[in-house]
Amino acid sequence: MRVLVSNDDGVDAPGIKILADALRNAGHEVMVVAPDRDRSGASNSLTLDTPIRAKQIDMHTYSVAGTPTDCVHLALTGLLNYDPDIVVSGINNTGNLGDDVIYSGTVSAAMEGRFLGLPAVAVSLVTLCREGQQAPQYETAAHAAINIVAQLKTDPLPADTILNVNVPDVTWQQMRGFKVTRLGNRHRSAPCLTQTDPRGHTIYWIGPAGPEQDAGPGTDFDAVRNTYISITPIHVDLTRYQALENVTRWTDRLTAHMDWPT
């Protein structure tokens, strides 16, 4: 398969290099189109008010001065002279669990691929970030990715589906298997951090994500915590169907009291 690989950690991040190498070793034709620097948290942002520069690093790699969404959009709408078969985004250097997916550039790169008609997978390694911990097990996440891509080739998903994959940071031998999960969610984010710069101006840092809230059995949080690879099928229909009836009552009342033109 012809695989387009992107990420949000940047073109030089170890995760994307290990992922691209693993896919090539599995027999796939791989093109990397990724941001020129870390663009974590960029979500689905698309650059519309300035031109975007793309630099070809080698025959199989482009560095783009833009967001993860920019990278995939450019790759699929003119940068490449062929059409890839699938988009794989990652390997992110931390998890994208629960409502993390709203902000994730890793997930958004995959989402853009799906918007433009391709199967798409986002792969994240849920690193533990403990002092003295061994190096992140990117090879484990890459091994999971190539197995998932193989399944997608033989048994495709519906056209509106993205796979959000979160891999525990352990060796492959320590892994307990795959689990299909739903997204959990977190409590409200921690407060922003306030500091004073050398000129006496107040500056702010976004605070850390909130702790787990909905993280019980069946969620992505629970699977990873129990050393399973979490696979969550997601899609981008944001309609809250359960609220349609209630909001319809509102609009009926509003319509009845408005002097609409005939």
UniProtKB/Swiss-Prot annotation:
UniProt-recorded Gene Ontology molecular function terms: 3'-nucleotidase activity; 5'-nucleotidase activity; exopolyphosphatase activity; metal ion binding; nucleotide binding
Subcellular location: Cytoplasm
Catalytic activity: a ribonucleoside 5'-phosphate + H2O = a ribonucleoside + phosphate
Gene Ontology CC: cytoplasm
Cofactor: a divalent metal cation
One Pfam family hit: SurE
Subcellular location, principal: cytoplasm
Record's keyword terms, sorted: Cytoplasm, Hydrolase, Metal-binding, Nucleotide-binding
Keyword presence, Nucleotide-binding: yes
Enzyme type, top EC level: hydrolase
Family: Belongs to the SurE nucleotidase family.
Function: Nucleotidase that shows phosphatase activity on nucleoside 5'-monophosphates.
Protein name: 5'-nucleotidase SurE
Species for this entry: Xylella fastidiosa (strain Temecula1 / ATCC 700964)
